[in-house]
Amino acid sequence: MIYLKYNCPLTYLILLKLEGGKTVEEKTDAEQRNATSEEDTEIFENPGEGLEKATFAAGCFWGIEEAFRQIKGVVATAVGYSGGHFKRPTYEQVCTLDTGHAEAVRVIFDPEIVSYKTLLDVFWKIHDPTTKDRQGPDVGKQYRSVIFYHSDEQKAAALASKEELEKSGAFKNPVVTEIVPVSEFYMAEDYHQQYFEKKGFLQNIFRSFKK
């Protein structure tokens, strides 16, 4: 695998759009789920037959979620808080108190369409896994790089993927990404869910390229 160091989800999404979606296929509106509707929240704990869960932390969860939402085979996404010791934290508490949580993205996917390895490949591309407790200007433990595995198979895949990345020489500095068992995932407030989509952020950027 060739590791292209986009280092942030926005760069990845813009390049994906400019390349015509050759890396991963863009989904139609009909395929995208609204994670915050009442009927859909259950899917993030109990996906149902034929679906699997993945959980990642890679900095501010807004852009990370949007990157995973573009992948064919991803059925639903939600942002939340994981890896901490504080029950049902709010965004303000995660940002200002030592709750130990990371801003995380829960991904529900169909392994018949997209593999967990593909999700790992995207994860490495959309952030800098060599910076501890920060991504770009965002500094704090909540912005740390983490792969939360849901099974022994995911753990093995994550460790192998990390080793492959380290051997590739793509990064000069050591990879500091944590690979840990999944812990309680607390859904973030509604206004954080699909933030880029709600704000039309990417659409405005893409329109500017056409001018």
From Swiss-Prot:
Enzyme class: oxidoreductase
Enzyme Commission number(s): 1.8.4.11
Active site: C60
Pfam families, per database record: PMSR
Catalytic activity field: L-methionyl-[protein] + [thioredoxin]-disulfide + H2O = L-methionyl-(S)-S-oxide-[protein] + [thioredoxin]-dithiol; [thioredoxin]-disulfide + L-methionine + H2O = L-methionine (S)-S-oxide + [thioredoxin]-dithiol
GO MF terms held by the record: L-methionine:thioredoxin-disulfide S-oxidoreductase activity; peptide-methionine (S)-S-oxide reductase activity
GO annotation, biological process: protein modification process
This protein's record includes keyword RNA-binding: no
UniProt keywords, alphabetically: Oxidoreductase
SUPFAM superfamilies: Peptide methionine sulfoxide reductase
Purpose: Has an important function as a repair enzyme for proteins that have been inactivated by oxidation. Catalyzes the reversible oxidation-reduction of methionine sulfoxide in proteins to methionine.
Family in the record: Belongs to the MsrA Met sulfoxide reductase family.
Record-given protein name: Peptide methionine sulfoxide reductase MsrA
Native species: Methanosarcina mazei (strain ATCC BAA-159 / DSM 3647 / Goe1 / Go1 / JCM 11833 / OCM 88)
Lineage: Archaea, Methanobacteriati, Methanobacteriota, Stenosarchaea group, Methanomicrobia
Gene that encodes it: msrA
